[in-house]
Amino acid sequence: MTIVKTKLNRRSFIRSSALAGGGLLLTFSWLAPACTTDSPKELTMPDNWYELNGFLKIGNNGAVTIMSPNPEIGQNVKTSMPMIVADELDVDWKFVLVEQAPLNTDIFTRQLAGGSQSIRQGWNGLRMAGATARRMLREAAAHEWKVPVDEITTEAGVLYHKGSGKEAGYGEMASAAAELTVPEEVELKDIKDFTIIGTSRKNVDGQKIVTGKPLFGLDYKTEGMLIAMIEHPPAFGMKLKSFDATEAKAMPGIKDVFAIKTYQDDYQMQWSDVTSFTELVAIVGNSTWEVMNAKLMLNVEWEPITADNTLGVPAGFESTADHNKKMAEAAAKPGREQRRDGNPEEAFKNAAKVIERTYTAPFQAHNPMEPMNFFADVKDDFALLAGPTQTPEFMEKSVAARLGLPLEKVDVQMTRMGGGFGRRLYGHFMVEAAVISQQMKAPVKLIYSREDDMSYGIYRPAYHALYRAALDADNNLIGFHVRMGGIPESPLHANRFPAGSVDNYLAESWTVDSNISTGAFRAPGSNFNAVAEQSFLDEVAEAAGKDPIQFRLDLLKRAQENPVGSNNDYDAARYAGVLEQVREKSGWDTNSEGKNRGVAAYFCHNSYVANVVDIANKDGNPVIEKVYASVDCGIVVNPDAAVNMTEGSIVDGIGHAMYSGLTFSEGYPDQTNFDMYRLIRHGEAPKEIEVHFVENNIDPTGLGEPPYPPVMGALANALYKAKGERYYHQPFVKNSFE
């Protein structure tokens, strides 16, 4: 077992207090906490349940409630995180209740859904939470029975003393435990003793989801609630000049039409807000249909922004042709040097063979199935907001600053989200809802249509990369050069593989400014790097006459045994481990004859994933028969959820690589709904996905995003085998609806 110190201060892991009617309550400062569940039918609720932010409650009947500060976005933290607490508490899973906590930054240090952080950053705190409660219950029993605490054991929510034969349920000792001082040290279980962690548990919201129970932001309703929508400029690079709402206000059910300003000239308040528009027009009415119709009757005049605009973005109306030209020009010049090993110029000069390729990817829209929406009820001295957001803590600050209210007077409640993928990290719609409610002096739900969301959203940046490799006369890789950039940011990870495995290495970055709003998109940067890098490495392996898996393994062996440089931010052994496993599980060496197979491996968010994609040609069209996935994400808390996330990432990655792309004409997206923006269809998904996890005792690492990037590279390499052509530009199939 592991002995750990508890930390007791204002933002400490654990606080203790007594519950009304008896019970033990522990509150935590979890970096990325627990989840919510329905009450098990076997469990009778205690008489005096009450809730506080970030706590574990034990009722006098043995029931356990764990509050979840983290937003639930489909990553299954509402199931997996309480499993960690329950295991260390040593309670039967059927006695666990979990509820969504309200936002409270006085208790929680981080309330965020993003960066694949929930389990990996919450792991230790969650374990300590359960272990501390268990220790206090053991101490209470030892005091009651007048025996040493080391003689008290637990199992499934029951305390035992073998010597006397005494036993008691947790509920019987909860009140006594609440009177004890929190221990300075607690014992954590040995990994081999886990009984809940590592077992598959169903999604606690599963029944509610499939039966249509109100869980999501669009489900949220309250008495007297009005509906609002936004009229945006017809293009990025424009601003409001004037508007005439006479006809719109005369429409049935319309309450008001007015301009709103949400921009704040403070980066700390504004970082999670869109920064492309400073003033918008709000339409408010009784129903969505009435507001949509009134919106069509608005007469709005817009004008171009000037070079000295408040937003600090370039003026002008941008088009895809201009974007591509600017990126190509930037890529043709030396960039900002981010890493240099050896003498890459000399290596390329003396190379027997040089391979050079260019890769590009367009802007992409997130397109979660639930469009942006948020509820706000703003009073003179208090604001209640509720809805789907990945960053409630940061948006609380933005809303408070914009409304001029103290932070403690803003209450943000989190609903389940119908998808996010990074889109809901940016809360402009939340600020807009608050400003509209303040103006109306009434509860309001702001709703974006699909066209609103796609036309005025936050996009995955456009990217462009130049890769070069130098081979000597013996086909050894002696030089590697990557020059990578984008609009408006570079996705370059200069210290990741193959850095550290090549003697002569150069990584450069560049950027092109834009007035189009961009931001995080599932596995930021990596969602382009993986397909470009892994496609290029496949070509280099082919040019060297080497098996693509063995070629990568040879490089990783060098990085592991004799690394170049000291700033390599990946574990070469874990990287090689997923490649070895996927080679074995896919039968790469024994079962590849006659198959069109592609392989790729990638590292991000502290996890490692390798894929093999099998493609068949049917009537001249590629059909994805099977995808193999090998995943090293450390200890797998909930295998069923882990498989689901991996499978979903694979389907999502294939769809975006094949079909998804957003182009612009004079500042406006050419694709504004699913009739123009292609997503993967059921018949195009892999017929079979086989997922394997590397077993180890490493603390959990990320999983919501790591399985997404590599499958795109494996797909590109499999398509090459099937079609005989390389795929350098995404989407591989243009926006076709044939």
List each model region and its residues.
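Cofactor-binding beta-sheet edge motifs in enzyme active sites
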Residues: 2-27, 39-738
